Amino acid sequence: MTRARRYVGLLMLAAGALVLAQEEAPSRTEFTLTAKAFRYSPDRIEVNQDDLVKVTIQSEDFAYSFAIDEYRIVRRVPPGGTTTFEFRADRAGTFRFYSNLTNDRAHADMQGRLVVRSK
């Protein structure tokens, strides 16, 4: 009887390990956006839910910012400089990213989309 219990216990442990191994680990995704002439390029980023996303933004002319309200992200990019940051895309949906600088109308029109595909 003890051997049978041990055997069943080992089978259950192996089955649990198999289930854990089959779960997908979050992917690491990297993007480089160029900010130039009040535009982001690319202006659309697509990731999977729970991905760890690394974003580098390069300014080719002026100072810019990058904001995604739903993820509480706000970063500044100096003229001709870069900024890099990471976040976990833990919410599925489509989210607007934009420059939140208010010194002129051109910044207000600078935007793009982050698409987070659900699991």
Regions found by a protein language model. Give the residues of each.
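Bacterial N-terminal signal peptides that target proteins for export
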Residues: 1-9
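Hydrophobic h-region of N-terminal signal peptides that target proteins for export
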Residues: 12-21
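Extracellular/periplasmic metallocenter environments
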Residues: 22-27, 77-119
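N-terminal edge beta-strand
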Residues: 24-52
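Beta-strand-rich interaction surfaces with strong enrichment in secreted/lumenal proteins
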Residues: 43-45, 72-76, 86
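Short edge beta-strand/loop segments characteristic of extracellular beta-sandwich folds
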Residues: 52-58
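Short proline/glycine-enriched turn/loop motifs at strand-loop junctions of beta-rich domains
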Residues: 59-63
